[in-house]
């Protein structure tokens, strides 16, 4: 009897595909054709059109700019952006991102977290009742 693989993740063979399409096929598609492959929320966002400033960000990608800085966290990552560098503002600083094929269809903000995990240190002297009687060093 053949032994089954216990891994739940699909094994990666060859190049990346998005909904059955290779990256080269995706890059040849128009926005409307690509939108048909996306979930409903992203598809509706594309059909509603882009603002002038969002069109400016897309134009910077097309012009081959080395790194694009933006505050647009809700913009969708398109196949033509693959391999480019992006800097997304998280409210404090610009977070550098290199766009990979696995990021297609996601939004810029997903890769630029706005909140960091807080790791608190130990309590100070006098912070708790038991620490009042601890001698200072």
Curated annotation (Swiss-Prot):
PROSITE patterns: RIBOSOMAL_S19 (PS00323). GO terms for biological process: ribosomal small subunit assembly; translation. The keyword Cytoplasm does not apply. One of its GO terms (molecular function) is structural constituent of ribosome. Keywords: Ribonucleoprotein, Ribosomal protein, RNA-binding, rRNA-binding. InterPro entries: Ribosomal_uS19 (IPR002222), Ribosomal_uS19_CS (IPR020934), Ribosomal_uS19_euk/arc (IPR005713), Ribosomal_uS19_SF (IPR023575). GO terms for cellular component: cytosolic small ribosomal subunit. The keyword Isomerase does not apply. Residues 115-137 are annotated as: Disordered. Belongs to the universal ribosomal protein uS19 family. Protein S19 forms a complex with S13 that binds strongly to the 16S ribosomal RNA. NCBIfam families: PRK04038.1, uS19_arch. This is Small ribosomal subunit protein uS19. It comes from Methanococcoides burtonii (strain DSM 6242 / NBRC 107633 / OCM 468 / ACE-M). The gene is rps19.
